[in-house]
C-alpha cells in the first residue's frame, strides 16, 4: 500500500438520496491539516469499526516513529487484536493512556523533548468513560477534561493528536 493522507469518511447522503450519486467524502488526516477527530454516532452505528479503519489509515500515512496510545473504555471484542500491545489501555486503565500522552505534551512544550513525530491518543467511548468517572470522582473528572482540553488546544503544533469516539 502507498502512503496516503486521505481517509474515506463515507458517502454524501444528499447526493445519494437526492440524485442516486455515490459521491465519496474524504478528509486529510495529516497532522498539519487535521490534528484531532471525533467519531460520533448512535449505538451500533459502526463507530468502533470506523476507529479501527482510522487507526489503520493513520499508521499507513505516518512515519515509522509515530506512536499510538489506545484507551478502550468499552473493552469489547472490537479491539481484541490490540490487547497484547504495550500501548493498549483497557477499561479502568484508559486514564493511564491520557497521563502518558499528557506527559509527552508537557515535555515537548517545556523543551525537554524536542521530538515532533506524531503521538496519537485514540479513546474509544470517551464520554462514557467521563460519565462513569463523574459518578465516582467529580474532581478527577474535571482534571481529565482539563488535560484533554489542553491536548486539543496545544497538541497540533507539538505533534500530539486526540481522536475519540462517543455516542
Where are these regions (language model features)?
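P-loop NTPase catalytic phosphate-binding loop
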Residues: 2-111, 117-120, 127-167
